[in-house]
Amino acid sequence: MGSKEVDLRLNLVESHINNNQYQLALQELLKVEAAAKHMSRFHFDSGMIYLGLQELEQSREGFARAVEIDEDFGEAWNNLGKIEEALGRDKDAEAAYRKAFSILTYVTPEFSAYNLGMLLLRQGRAKEAEEFGRKALARNWLYIPAYKLLADAFVAQNRLDDAEAVLKSGLEADMNSTSTILALAEHKMRMGKTAEAAVLFDRIVKQFPNSSEAKAARNYLEFLQ
């Protein structure tokens, strides 16, 4: 099988992955194994397929092999970190996230910074989580989940005003982020600013009635009445 045919078949594999058709993707992947098993792309696709099939150990094998072949494969390192974390191997997950973030050619380093920050926060390492929340936003200030991470890191350090400020910054980055509006409203509730919180809950209900956050906002408004 020539390299052009391998490339075309891997394109088909990835199309199936993107459409959540993991069994079809695996069938196509196995057809090119003999010709493509030396490629990091082949093993990355394998990792993605087994992740979709909830076969975490086999998914881990795919991503681990991908980074063995290409040590600078940032996305594979990040995904390996997520699998290690899901398997309860926090130390290995942290190492993989740190490696991903250190790769200068990795196009989306904010993902690994965020994932690492969330891991650190879960472990009670709030100051380090703050550092990686900041790093995620330094790489991509439009990556909205990082604002919530940074705010939660501040809350864990009892820096409530800083948490409020960073959530407001997140809202400035994306005025239509219902998750950020809800997070800011909930934070204002914790700070006793119930009138300001009610305005934000009302905004979600009126402007984004079909959002997943609208139900929570309605419940808060009923509680505040």
State what each model feature region is:
Residues 3, 170, 174-225:
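Terminal, low-structured helical/coil segments at or just beyond the last alpha-helical repeat
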Residues 35, 69, 103-105, 139, ...:
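Structural marker of alpha-solenoid helical repeat scaffolds
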Residues 8, 42, 76, 83, ...:
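TPR alpha-solenoid repeat register
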